[in-house]
């Protein structure tokens, strides 16, 4: 079986139906470059508007649906279908064919085979799944557009970052602990003509590459803070109680594997309490000599808010395995470490100083991305800017808060309904009497200020 020929023939078939264009239209022009997946309902609605044969093909590729064998064979040919079955990309089921728990994501001019997301019908989330998400796209957008001799990607997953790096480098090493992801990323490298430059390694972080050094090292590691005794969360996400279990080993290995004048780029999420940032403390300890480091902190939110989101996600994805008291377990974990806030980060480190103390900057890009940030604002002086996924409120160059559709809906409820809605939030977050009183006071003041400032009218005018 010639794997390379089979996968390149598969790509030709996707090209024949202009899959890149169709995927972009189906997923929406904004979502297409921000998130690999639109909601299933939105995808189904868009696909149903296509001609019948094309609609069936897009259900097969975008949603991973089982489709009549004759339709797929007519499109791809019997030989290619049989070859893809032998390869493990397609499976047979009583006269139907479907991708084997995969979907085909289109990004820029690439085709990526990844596992069907858990929020699609029939999707699952397992430790061996090949993950791609908004964080993958965020890292892709931050990649430097200049030539590198040798690149290394740690926790390479689907291989998309190494495929991108291959365009601007002589060679790329990609390391992944998940053996299934290694196999699928080898498919993706072939499909996207990167297999001659990208060298895949199955193993744990730096172990497979031994003493090799690189001009660029990038990583999108497991970073979700999660109780270590709860084992249902997949290894592609869970990062230990502070989210630093994997990150710690990556940071401490940089000195050995990053060349002089080399660059390190990593994205992730973390927890903090004001200026007590475990992620920053790790960096200061491990990289105290020879580096220029910028840690960009953004999308900060109250940990209670994050806990509710995480608990709901766990129930929706692993309902049978999620403990009923998941919120309590998550809050207890964060309380053990005295953490109060959740954030996203981008870390850029350049190895440019010899025998000089590291210059380390912590840069907070925005304050809060929720209605709780609004009450701090002088709304009469705010400028409202429409961004792809939310409305941003600025005072000068300072982002005060963001307003998404949920907040717009809340504001439209007016007076009493707003307080009822706020009480529901308090219940979800298990606020005590003092926290409840303070939160309700903030929301009540915010609602009056927003109505007074005609915020809804201003948003409608954008």
Question: For each of these PLM feature ranges, what is it?
Answer:
Residues 305-375:
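Flexible, glycine-/basic-rich loop-and-beta segments that form/coincide
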Residues 124-135, 145, 177-325:
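S-adenosylmethionine
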Residues 93-166:
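SAM-dependent Rossmann-like transferase core, predominantly class I methyltransferases
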Residues 2-42, 47, 71, 83, ...:
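S-adenosylmethionine-dependent methyltransferases
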Residues 1-55, 95, 100, 119-121, ...:
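Acidic, low-complexity/disordered tracts enriched in E/D and polar residues
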Residues 53-101, 140, 399-462:
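Long, charge-rich, low-complexity alpha-helical segments
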Residues 149, 170, 215:
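Conserved acidic residues
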Residues 171-176:
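Conserved SAM-binding motif I beta-strand of class I
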